[in-house]
Amino acid sequence: MYKNRKYDLVIVGGGIIGTYCAYHALRRGKSVLLLEKDVQPYEASFRNFGQAVPSGQALDSWFDYGRKSLKIYKDLQEEVDISVVKNGSWYVASDDQEMILLEEMMQLFKDRDYTSRLYTASETLEINPHFKKEYVKGGLFIPEEASLNPLVMVHRVREFMIKNLGLHYHNLCPVIAVEKKRGIAMITTSKKQTFWGDQVILANGRDTQFLLPEHYPTAELKISKLQMMRLAPQKKILKSNILTGLTIRRYDSFKSCPSFSKIYTSSEQKQLQAKGIHILFKQADDGSIILGDSHEYVPAGEQANFGFEVSSEINEMMLAEAKRITSLENWNVDSTWAGFYLQGTQSEVFTKVVDDVIHIINGIGGKGMTTSPGFTAEYILKLYS
């Protein structure tokens, strides 16, 4: 178990943030230990669509992290199959206002040398005949974007690092204490093991109550509960990431459009937005379709107030809206689930350095799959500059 060994970097948390911190540090020749409390990580990094869509991120900040992440994903895919598929993203407008936003968004992307193409309603339907004619006003296609399988991507990257980059990894290894001692970080596990690191990164997701809880201000963090579902395998018809009208109204990039502040919201849209619902589709290799999602929020530290139920009302609202958008072979629901992630309220990610050697990276919210590789690349670069 390498007990008492000192590493350049110890990382607590095997999700996407921890995994890519390890990846970038190893690429810089650092010795890295990755500790995971469970048999394998299974939280927000895995309970998502697996869409890498920089197009939805706030322009001139997280949009750039998303573009960098896409390159990292594609470069890594050339070395090992981490499930990246360059299939592009479709935004589908449901009314004239959303179509105006797509037109403005295309120009904003052009200004940033990010390829996109606008399609009329008839062109969109010709390429995507499963969309319903009465829903579609037009579409915007971004060819460079990609999808991944969230159930396998992080695991495959970790195995690649173990086999090829010298990563040391321990699962079933809950960390119960982190402190600075003798000028470096001392990490203690529930099995009474001690590890040492010149630096330690805490990337432990929504579990903020165990390690240094006093450094997670509840006023700056909230927890989101989302609901998603998987429809039964069926004929392959969705060739790209599919993002719809409510997504156009929700995603940060569109807030940069000149007309965004002027759009009208109907009472039906407001009912869905009250549950944080916008509709995304992604079809997996086995033909199953991931559909969602919704968003509810509580302050950090109050996640028990969510309860443990998956709301059938929310699922029915999502299915009803999805059926307005597209025709499918069947709408049989194979499984439903809830996901939880920590999100900053005053910043797009929560970072803090404690005693010069302990680094907290958390609260990246729902943009982890799209932006984590790029964001962690910059963080590790600064750490070792």
Walk through the language-model features, giving the residues of each.
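Beta1/beta-strand and adjacent pyrophosphate-binding region of the FAD-binding site
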Residues: 2-15
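Short beta-strand to alpha-helix junction loop
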Residues: 64-65, 92-101, 140-159, 309-314, ...
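Helical element adjacent to the flavin cofactor pocket in flavoenzyme catalytic cores
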Residues: 141-185, 189-191, 195-199
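Flavin-dependent oxidoreductases
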Residues: 178-183, 193-283, 304
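C-terminal catalytic lobe of FAD-dependent flavoproteins
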Residues: 276, 285-290, 296-385
